[in-house]
Amino acid sequence: MLWEILVPRKWNNGRPVRTRHHRVFDAKVRDICGGLTIHPPTIKGEWISTEGTLYIDSTIPVRVSCTREQIEQIMDFTAKHYKQKAVLAYKVSDEVIVKNYPEN
């Protein structure tokens, strides 16, 4: 399956997340499922927490080919790593084809 998860560009206090912090996320995702595709940070969203707080986010869409269990593991890590109250991921496709060409 192909999943997309939205990773925050800023902390809840509005300060930008540093590149080196994102690199730790990238390495963890590679460890879990073998790779990731990072898209340009163009997604802006708004949501209301269970406590009634409005959050306005700018996020980085990250796509991963993995199982349901792996995306949930990635979501759990994302919540802890970025100190998030909620994490959004959604299935993009049920079918993913990867062809390897070792001779190239």
Question: Residue locations for each model-derived region?
Answer:
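Positively charged, small/polar-rich N-terminal and surface patches that mediate targeting and assembly
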Residues: M1-N104
